[in-house]
């Protein structure tokens, strides 16, 4: 297994793209997450979900967001200092379903070096999580803190 390259602000450029590994969303995991964090009937029960606006079991949007974060941390955004957010916008254009295989694609859309803290900058990243049919199920535009490469590295 190869080690993921750890990137600093100095390594990044606008238009740079990253692709994560994949994750299989299972019905049992949807229900487990929902039972603890988003206990609404359409996330917990197939019959209730079928009668809902979703017309079938759907993962919580927060579960979908958590999976996206896992994929980004596991190599989808290999920033040396981790993924440290300053804010952003989220959308869920389609529900995530049991059996979906999810993958995140990200693009750097802006880099702003800090004037007051020259050792860091803010990087704006647009990430889209797709299912196996290339349907977008999660959109995130985030402002992230990224450090410059330390001297000698």
Locate the predicted segments by residue.
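HotDog/MaoC-like acyl-thioester-processing domains
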Residues: 1-14, 92-153
